[in-house]
UniProtKB/Swiss-Prot annotation:
Protein name: GTP cyclohydrolase 1
Similarity comment text for this entry: Belongs to the GTP cyclohydrolase I family.
InterPro entries the UniProt entry points to: GTP-CH-I_C/QueF, GTP-CH-I_N, GTP_CycHdrlase_I, GTP_CycHdrlase_I_CS, GTP_CycHdrlase_I_dom
EC id: 3.5.4.16
Keywords: GTP-binding, Hydrolase, Metal-binding, Nucleotide-binding, One-carbon metabolism, Zinc
Gene (UniProt): folE
GO cellular component: cytoplasm
Keyword Lipid metabolism: no
Subunit structure: Toroid-shaped homodecamer, composed of two pentamers of five dimers.
Binding site for Zn(2+): C78, H81, C150
Catalysed transformations (reactions): GTP + H2O = 7,8-dihydroneopterin 3'-triphosphate + formate + H(+)
Amino acid sequence: MSKVDHEKIQQAVVMILEAIGEDPAREGLEDTPKRVAKMYEEVFAGLNQDPKEHFATIFGEDHEELVLVKDIPFFSMCEHHLVPFFGKAHVGYIPKGGKVTGLSKLARAVEAVARRPQLQERITSTVADALVETLEPHGVIVVVEAEHMCMTMRGVKKPGAATVTSAVRGTFANDAAARAEVLSLIKG
């Protein structure tokens, strides 16, 4: 999807409003199709981004200890129901060979992956794999905690239920002590 088709989205929103028994021409709804199209362009902007692009700039730094950025806020849209889920991502890696990336790049990669119709599990593994493929670190850990509106406002209706996913690569997959250490840092 290279460009969002605003006209198609607007037509679809009108059809949905009519299908639920609303009048899309009534005050309050008349501009809703345009607003929804604009919103979708923003919230699905990650469809045109490769998270690895954010790691293109690599800095030489003799540091082979943990780098962890935690509590990165994000939002995404559940691909099953097209309703939001949101939470925090924690991204850590142990650099190898003097290859580090900017801290903001970790947050940008999370954002690029989250801004598309998505699954939490896929966000977690995609960010981890992008780091592995570009930086080739000793280890990577990504932990994502989120509340899914598809569980909060429909179906089971359990507000506040948190879903936690993790992806561990390299050292963090093979060394239980290293994994336990970073998980304790994430917990704070």
